Amino acid sequence: MKINTVLFDLDGTLINTNELIISSFLHTLNHYYSNQYKREDVLPFIGPSLHDTFSKIDASKVEEMITCYRQFNHEHHDELVEEYETVYETVQELKKQGYKIGIVTTKARQTVEMGLKLSKLDQFFDVVVTIDDVEHVKPHPEPLQKALELLDAKPEETLMVGDNHHDIVGGQNAGTKTVAVSWTLKGRAYLEAYKPDYVLDKMSDLLPILSRING
């Protein structure tokens, strides 16, 4: 089966928002629980929705913690977000070759648009599905299914590319092929345990993989 559609996660996959996310969590948690959380403590919070994460910490303060997080995140966005090598060129080439390309992210649309504009990737994507567009987040298949529906694409003709197990399992649940990125903050072995179909060392590795699949 040939591939004609590629879906990407955003944070940690297309743009390096790791420092922004970690700093936003530390700022928020230190505000409520002074000096109780260190950098390594917040790494597991990367991937799930803010609502899920803060619910487990204190269900009564979820909304105010999300507000605190987002305020810091927006204020420091442009200074803390970095590019990943070969991402721009690869996405540009996929578009040029006629692939349908989309983003499936657990972020809110406003912050997604900030990241895409900063990285100049906003011109390429046919569809962007955010947490604002769905009831369930990855690894539930709903966000991917929504993107596929909007793109008029079939799961068996689609790759899902991501840096977290939510992306890989989400792709598997939706019936797509899955691609893990080795630059995940959680380490290559962590993602390989979820048995993705392919692993990239850099984003441009995606192009020869697609050439091989589509022969």
UniProtKB/Swiss-Prot annotation:
GO terms for molecular function: inorganic diphosphate phosphatase activity; magnesium ion binding; phosphoglycolate phosphatase activity. Keywords: Hydrolase, Magnesium. The keyword Signal does not apply. Gene3D superfamilies: HAD superfamily/HAD-like, Putative phosphatase, domain 2. It catalyses: diphosphate + H2O = 2 phosphate + H(+). GO terms for biological process: DNA repair. CDD domains: HAD_PPase (cd02616). The active site is at D9 (nucleophile). The keyword Aminoacyl-tRNA synthetase does not apply. Its cofactor is Mg(2+). Its EC number is 3.6.1.1. PANTHER family: PHOSPHOGLYCOLATE PHOSPHATASE (PTHR43434), PYROPHOSPHATASE PPAX (PTHR43434:SF26). Hydrolyzes pyrophosphate formed during P-Ser-HPr dephosphorylation by HPrK/P. Might play a role in controlling the intracellular pyrophosphate pool. HAMAP family: Pyrophosphat_PpaX. This is Pyrophosphatase PpaX. It comes from Bacillus mycoides (strain KBAB4).
